[in-house]
């Protein structure tokens, strides 16, 4: 890599199933990985020798299912006892354990049992995306804009920001995926001077968002947003997998539920069938020797696939209705409906959406896999002052808080301070008081959600306001100040008005929230793993070089024509050096240095022997 640091910031779409990275240097470029693919699987695999990330990890998943981790985005910022985590754990081949209420992934790596938080796994994927960008730019990358589903809550946003920090990136901004896609659309095929309402329908591998934006010139104002952080292509694959499992059991009497390798192979076949059915109406699924020597073969029509996922497909219209209702806009006022995310390629999803908008033609002009990273790169260029073109110079992004924020009051009532769809950044205030005479401490539990009963919302954390002057109940004036930054992350302050006493917290004991010490420790660990990866690669390279050199010299020594030209003494010296080199290859775990020394030693003897012929 050339010296120097990239002055801009890369845009990373950190996806559930695939990730994508883009950079802006006078224009946006989506960067391909070393395999030439413009999207990289969000997979990390651990083996006795090394760690693999991206395509290499996904390609060996069937051989190493228990130590191949994916779907980290479905764990990040969630509690272990979260209903969706418990449901997902039944389908994942890797092990998830409970550590202080947080889900942690347990794997075998370098012949030891290791545990990683979802943030650390996501950080490994982010590091990979950073390296892909560095290989193209030729400079060190330090800054990034990372995208998250619009419907991610505070804990999920903070955990994603922490993942960025662990990967060694300065995360300038966390932006919402549909908003990033809207930028890509507004600067690309959807370029227009007229004011319009645009609905972004973003259905990816694991998450689903709908955002309604008003675009006027370079000002993008999000009017409302809704979604489901646990709906996407993975769920359609799971339904297909269950169907195929039942079919295999019916035909053979064999149940593959507990065989991680068979499940992985069948899931891969299900995913392939799903993709194929977007362009044809029937496909055949074949998996040789799936389980107990029995082959699996099945014919699947598009109609059957649609039937298996009918309820999920239909559920995608609920957030569409919600955003229209929240923005107080009728569907006839929507000028464009833009498709984003790989799962919007499914014909039935497109038909349901088009029918909902009375046969409206859907906008398919932007690449559904790349639009989010594109928008993030534009935002990165704006934040680092690298955007020079007129169209990006005046671009302004006004996003919203996806869920209401507030405090728990007496009787578990939810007191909303920041209503959902409030434009961020924002500061909102609300006054409270004491419930008992002479009460000197009030606890403020902070929640996020839309339910009246606090217990049905997400607890983000709690704090105490102490040393309140003794007064009759209802007299003290306590003000809660909620500050939401441009990343959608919350800071809360409470003040007792008569004394000015305040308690200021950035929610500390929230789920999935890492302390700065924990982040620092994980950053150091990430560096160690990276160093171990590099050492392994060097060793592998040194071994390959030595093996191929040994093979070529062995050929020389055994070739009667070539060996006859060597003096007898020289030949025996080469054979002795060859034997030393072979011994180095036989050592159980030789270092790259030992292998290099063996190669240099052999080369020295051979060069000397050849020159004295």
From Swiss-Prot:
Region (Required for interaction with ribosomes): 601-613
Single annotated GO MF: heat shock protein binding
Record-listed N-acetylalanine modification sites: 2
Binding site for ATP: 16-18, 73, 205-207, 271-278, 342
Compartmental location: Cytoplasm
Motif position, Contributes to ribosome binding: 428-430
Enzyme nomenclature, EC number: 3.6.4.10
Quaternary context: Binds to ribosomes. Binds close to the ribosomal tunnel exit via contacts with both ribosomal proteins RPL35, RPL39 and RPL19, and rRNA. Directly interacts with nascent polypeptides. This interaction is dependent on the ribosome-associated complex (RAC). Interacts with SSE1. Interacts with FES1. Interacts with NAP1.
Nucleotide binding domain (NBD), as annotated region: 2-391
Name the UniProt record assigns to this protein: Ribosome-associated molecular chaperone SSB1
Role, per record: Ribosome-bound, Hsp70-type chaperone that assists in the cotranslational folding of newly synthesized proteins in the cytosol. Stimulates folding by interacting with nascent chains, binding to short, largely hydrophobic sequences exposed by unfolded proteins, thereby stabilizing longer, more slowly translated, and aggregation-prone nascent polypeptides and domains that cannot fold stably until fully synthesized. The Hsp70-protein substrate interaction depends on ATP-binding and on allosteric regulation between the NBD and the SBD.
Keywords, comma-separated and alphabetical: Acetylation, ATP-binding, Chaperone, Cytoplasm, Hydrolase, Nucleotide-binding, Phosphoprotein, Protein biosynthesis
Family, similarity comment: Belongs to the heat shock protein 70 family. Ssb-type Hsp70 subfamily.
GO CC annotation: cytoplasm; cytosol; nucleus; plasma membrane
Note: Present with 170000 molecules/cell in log phase SD medium.
Catalyzed chemical reaction(s): ATP + H2O = ADP + phosphate + H(+)
Residue interval(s) of motif Nuclear export signal: 574-582
Keyword check for Acetylation: yes
Organism whose genome encodes this protein: Saccharomyces cerevisiae (strain ATCC 204508 / S288c)
GO BP terms: 'de novo' cotranslational protein folding; chaperone cofactor-dependent protein refolding; cytoplasmic translation; protein refolding; regulation of translational fidelity; ribosomal subunit export from nucleus; rRNA processing; translational frameshifting
Modified residues (Phosphothreonine): 47, 431
């Amino acid at each position: 890599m050339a010296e120097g640091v990239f002055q801009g910031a890369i845009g990373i779409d950190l996806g559930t199933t695939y990730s994508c990275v883009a950079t802006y240097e006078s224009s946006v470029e989506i960067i391909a990985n070393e395999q030439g693919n413009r999207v990289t699987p969000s997979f990390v695999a651990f083996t006795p020798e090394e760690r693999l990330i991206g395509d290499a990890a996904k390609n060996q998943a069937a051989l190493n299912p228990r130590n191949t981790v994916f779907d980290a985005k479905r764990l990040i910022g969630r509690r272990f006892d979260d209903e969706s985590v418990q449901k997902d754990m039944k389908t994942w081949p890797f092990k998830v354990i409970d550590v202080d209420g947080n889900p942690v992934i347990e794997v075998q790596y370098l012949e030891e049992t290791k545990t990683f938080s979802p943030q650390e796994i996501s950080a490994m994927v982010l590091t990979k995306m950073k390296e892909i960008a560095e290989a193209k730019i030729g400079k060190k990358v330090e800054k990034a804009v990372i995208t998250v589903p619009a419907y991610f809550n505070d804990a999920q946003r903070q955990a994603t920001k922490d993942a960025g920090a662990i990967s060694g990136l300065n995360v300038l901004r966390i932006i919402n995926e549909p908003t990033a896609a809207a930028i890509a659309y507004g600067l690309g095929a959807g370029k227009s001077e007229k004011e319009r309402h645009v609905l972004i329908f973003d259905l990816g591998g694991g998450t689903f968002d709908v955002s309604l934006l008003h675009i006027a010139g370079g000002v993008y104002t999000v009017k409302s947003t809704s979604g489901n952080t646990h709906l996407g292509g993975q769920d359609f694959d799971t339904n297909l997998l269950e169907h195929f499992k039942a079919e295999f059991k019916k035909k053979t009497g064999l149940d593959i539920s507990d065989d991680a390798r068979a499940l992985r192979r069948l899931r891969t076949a299900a995913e392939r069938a799903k993709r194929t059915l977007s362009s044809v109406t029937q496909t055949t699924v074949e998996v040789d020797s799936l389980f107990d020597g029995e082959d699996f073969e099945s014919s699947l029509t598009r109609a059957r696939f649609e039937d298996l996922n009918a309820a999920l497909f239909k559920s995608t219209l609920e957030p569409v209705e919600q955003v229209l209702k929240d923005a107080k806009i009728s569907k006839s006022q929507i000028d464009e409906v833009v498709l984003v995310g790989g799962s919007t390629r499914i014909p039935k999803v497109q038909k349901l959406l088009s029918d909902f908008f009375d046969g409206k033609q859907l906008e398919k002009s932007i690449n559904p896999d790349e639009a989010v990273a594109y928008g993030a790169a534009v935002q990165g260029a704006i934040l680092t002052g690298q955007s020079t073109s007129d169209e990006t110079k005046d671009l302004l992004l006004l996003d919203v808080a996806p869920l209401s924020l507030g405090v728990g009051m007496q009787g578990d009532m939810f007191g909303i301070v920041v209503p959902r769809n409030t434009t961020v950044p924002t500061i909102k205030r609300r006054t409270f008081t004491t419930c008992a005479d002479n009460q000197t401490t009030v606890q403020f539990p902070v929640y996020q959600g839309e339910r009246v009963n606090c217990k049905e919302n997400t607890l983000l954390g709690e704090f105490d306001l102490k040393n309140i002057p003794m007064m009759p109940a209802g007299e003290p004036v306590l003000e809660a100040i909620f500050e939401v930054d441009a990343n959608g992350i919350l800071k809360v302050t409470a003040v007792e008005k008569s004394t000015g006493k305040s308690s200021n917290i950035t929610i500390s004991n929230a789920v999935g929230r890492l302390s700065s010490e924990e982040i620092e420790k994980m950053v150091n660990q990430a560096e160690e793993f990276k160093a171990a990866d590099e050492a392994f690669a060097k060793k592998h390279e040194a071994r390959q070089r030595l093996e191929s050199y040994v093979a070529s010299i062995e050929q020389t020594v055994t070739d009667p024509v070539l060996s006859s030209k060597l003096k007898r003494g020289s030949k025996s010296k080469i054979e002795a050096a060859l034997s030393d080199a072979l011994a180095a290859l036989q050592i159980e775990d030789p270092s790259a240095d030992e292998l290099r020394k063996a190669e240099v030693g052999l080369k020295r003897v051979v060069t000397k022997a050849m020159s004295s012929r």
